[in-house]
Amino acid sequence: MNDSKLFFQFLFPQGYEVFLFDDVKNPPNLFVAHYYTDDEVERYFSAVDNYHSSYNRLHCIQLPVLFRILYCCGTRIGETLGIRKKDIDLESGIIRLTETKNGKERYVTMGGELLALARRFADRTFYQIADDEYVFRNKNGGGLKYDTIKHIHREILAMAGIPFVGNSHGPRIHDWRHTFAIRSFKHMSDNGTDMYVALPILSTYLGHGTIMATEHYLRLTLEMFPEIEEKMGKTAEKVFGGIMYEGN
């Protein structure tokens, strides 16, 4: 776009009729990412594990798994609700995500504690459902809907004593994905991984269409943990100058 504008600016004084447009900028992202602190994580999942619903008795055994997948695997809520029985390998802990934002399936891995919890969940529920049915279900046997989980999320925040600010400040369900990404960058940095090596790895794992969305998470990580930026030096300023990012 800039090269074209310069060319038109050159033509205009030569007598050519051209139209010069103002620079087009992407609209700002109005949502403010919330990073769940260690204390908030502990309180939130304590509330999840003690959540009961007379409306759907499955909630007490499926919500601890569902919300931990969001936090521990960094999945989007739509991808998580789209998990079917056949998508989970309870031996390896690998989950196949098929209902993704960009239509490309990918894989995430459950760690030891989450995998143990998922196995207990499977022991109690998988015998009731076919391979192609959703694992997170409503009381009628259909897949859970986003609006239901959104409502439960608000209830859990209240139980945990975590204020819901609203007005694009959350904390939202999607902020578990933000928290996963930031913690992943921090963990890799602490283990000596160069951030420019970590960037494409995490971008692929998160299923981003381009690396720009992942760069946004790296920017947030550097803001929260300045010591990482000090390791990176002045290169970070060159990389992040003027970057706009896509939905994540």
Question: What is the meaning of each model-derived region?
Answer:
Residues 1-13, 22, 110:
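Non-catalytic DNA-binding core/recognition domains of DNA-processing enzymes
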Residues 16-48, 98, 138-140:
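Flexible interdomain linker/hinge and immediately adjacent N-terminus
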Residues 53-57, 151-200, 204, 208:
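Short, basic (Lys/Arg/His-rich) helix/loop patches that form interaction surfaces
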Residues 102-119, 132-154, 166-173:
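C-terminal catalytic core of Y-nucleophile DNA break-rejoin enzymes
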Residues 73, 78, 82-116:
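Conserved tyrosine-mediated DNA breakage-rejoining catalytic core shared by Y-recombinases
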Residues 46-77:
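Basic, Lys/Arg- and aromatic-enriched nucleic-acid-binding interface segment
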Residues 35, 99, 206-234:
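Catalytic-site neighborhood detector that most strongly recognizes the C-terminal catalytic loop/helix
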Residues 232-248:
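C-terminal secondary-structure termini that scaffold catalytic or DNA-interacting sites
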